[in-house]
Amino acid sequence: MDLVLLQNKLDNLSFAVLFVTMLVYWGGLAFPNIPFFPTLGTAGMAIANLCMACLLGARWMEGGYFPISNLYESLFFLAWGVTTIHLLAEWLSRSRLVGAATAPVAMGIAAFAALSLPDEMQSSAPLVPALKSNWLMMHVSVMMLSYSALIVGSLLAIAFLIVTFGQPVELKGSSIGTGSFRKREPQAPAASTASNLDEGLSMGSAQATAVLTPVSTPQAPSFSLNRMSLAESLDNLSYRMIGLGFPLLTVGIIAGAVWANEAWGAPWSWDPKETWALITWLVFAAYLHARITRGWQGRRPAYLATGGFFVVWVCYLGVNLLGKGLHSYGWFF
């Protein structure tokens, strides 16, 4: 069996399937009454996941080592991780919006790996002595899975902001809510609130931070119950995916420190990759701290997770391509 030819076919097939799957998910949002779109999208993600798993398996058989030693391999491992976390998130939520957010990212990763990287970066090569260690699988695979979970969680936070138009909302279970959906309204003039509220309560309601019965205004459109239910689902699912990715990131950083100490005699050298991994850890630690101890929900943690989305990409790809250090792939410099 020609493993190189098989890999070439599988990486192009993965890209093609993900591209079609992205269109299917977007079509499902545009035409929600067509019943087979969600099932077709899930099937497409599962097929792409299987194709990339076979690609990585063939790569492993060809090179004789776990295939996460260069940019091409790590990109497909990341895309495989994103599709795996997607399938978990979609199973938990049953929402077609999950695929509409994650499929374009998975497709973009596969396209970059299959169509943009030079041929010499796509070919398998013997490992350098420093990488011939069991820590390669332990450290890098866990880091890549953490990136996958954090990326999916951040994408769901971005989807939450889109669904709510970036408006402040109080969700079920909020530390400041009462167990029902409420939208925070700007302070309305007394003339407009008098027609909706009892005269004896109008002065108190003018200073309240939330109105139990929202008043539609040009600045603050009211939301339907379905939209608010979707927003709550996205907020909760984003929290759970980031809650999955953060421990993996922690374990991956610790494993990397142990490996570095074994290979170079120092657990931490402030390499650009190490520095940005620490920044990523701090961003998502702040996210979880705000949610767990401060009771944040909705817009504020979603903005923090959105920032974390870009930090993850700088940590993974930006530093590797542009930075100087032990983790640089040296494509641009």
From Swiss-Prot:
GO terms for cellular component: plasma membrane-derived thylakoid membrane
GO MF: heme binding
Top-level taxon: Bacteria
Keyword Transcription: no
Positions of transmembrane segments: 17-37, 38-58, 71-91, 97-117, 142-162, 241-261, 268-288, 302-322
Location(s), subcellular: Cellular thylakoid membrane
Key words, A-Z: Cytochrome c-type biogenesis, Membrane, Thylakoid, Transmembrane, Transmembrane helix
Any one GO biological process: cytochrome complex assembly
Record Pfam families: Cytochrom_C_asm (PF01578)
Quaternary structure note: May interact with ccs1.
Function recorded in the entry: Required during biogenesis of c-type cytochromes (cytochrome c6 and cytochrome f) at the step of heme attachment.
Similarity-based family: Belongs to the CcmF/CycK/Ccl1/NrfE/CcsA family.
UniProt protein name: Cytochrome c biogenesis protein CcsA
Native source organism of the sequence: Acaryochloris marina (strain MBIC 11017)
